[in-house]
Amino acid sequence: MKKYSLDKFKENRKNKEMKKLTIITTIAISVLILLALYMANSSFRSFIDTYILRKEISEENANSIIIDTEKASLIYAYDKNLVVYSDGNLNFYDVTAKQVANIEITLSRPIADSEKKYLVLGDYGSQKICLLKDNELVWQKDVDGKVSKISVNREGYVAVSVTGTTYESIVMVYNPKGDLQFSKYISQYVLGIDISEDHKYLAIAEMDNTKISPTTKIELVSMELATSNSEKATVNSYQASTNEYLSGIKFQNKKNLICCFDSYILKLNEKENKKIYELSENTAYTDINMLSGFIHVDKETSSVFKSDYRLKINSNDEKAKEKVYIIEGNIKDIKSKDEKIALHLGTKVEFVGKNGWLDKKYKSSQEIKDVVLSNEIGAMIHKNKIDIIEL
């Protein structure tokens, strides 16, 4: 009797374990099938994104700012805010399209840059620059010369490049309080400037136009050394070949400067300069405005898919596998900020994360003029309104 009970108990336990294993296996297979369908079938993916994951947002369901965008000389997204400059007023809106702040300031041709809670504004071709934090003015001043480029890091350090002096260009760096740290005199036109997040380095991209074929040079400057002697503070530099076009520079991971040329991506730091990616002739768009890595859109010459374009997300680590996102439709533009990517597809915008997965999709009945984004919000600009969504 005892033996029978023990055998029966073992058999029942074995059956329960088999049932549990069968259930787990069935769930795992179902998940894999659903995942495969989601990846391969656009209709199924659209259904899941729209009705299950609620990723798709129509213009009727977006928060809107009713405004004549033709009269706005600046529309810019930073942190959780949208900034609109018009008629001497800098207006700030949150993700619900509610105006949360206003600053009166005179800017003829405003340009902007931001990192985290800091926003720097400059009056291109004029003298005014100002720093804002959390929608409040921290400092403003007029500089000698004409503002051409501005940059701010996440700690509030500001770099500004000016022209129109006895030098071709002057780059000035200010601390978060607005105190001038140093000036560096440049004999060439400045294409771009950036400050590392720990404010140890300043990067300056220069273009020599004095020859028949222009050349680009990138300098890495120690900000500590520059405070005592800015002319002897360059710790590394890179000289590009003739006719290599530079589209942008961006500090990533504190010490690494990522430089985007028309045919390759370069990594520059104090110890080395190295080409980390060769772009192909099929590359239509590139962008390096990420926390880490870079993105590019390639046109596929032959494909079993309907789409002709692929978004490819790359790490700065050459050994890491790139992530691929299939683009359906004709792409108008691509933008990135930190960990978010915006694909402008005419009447819709797809927001993709750094993992290569769709975060949000916005659909409109009319052509979208432009898209601006931060790591927190995306804004679609129409002629008579701006639609805002949270990312």
Residue positions per predicted region:
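Repeated scaffold domains used in trafficking and secretory/extracellular systems
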Residues: I66-Y76, I105-K117, G145-R154, I186-E197, ...
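Non-cytosolic head/periplasmic domains of membrane-anchored proteins
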Residues: T106-D208, I212
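Acidic, serine/threonine- and glycine-rich low-complexity intrinsically disordered segments
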Residues: L191-D308
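Hydrophobic beta-strand positions that form the internal "hydrophobic ladder"
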Residues: N81-L82, L119, Y157-A159, H199-L202, ...
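N-terminal Lys/Arg-rich, disordered targeting/topogenic segments
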Residues: M1-T22
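Hydrophobic membrane-insertion alpha-helices, especially the h-region
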Residues: K20-M39
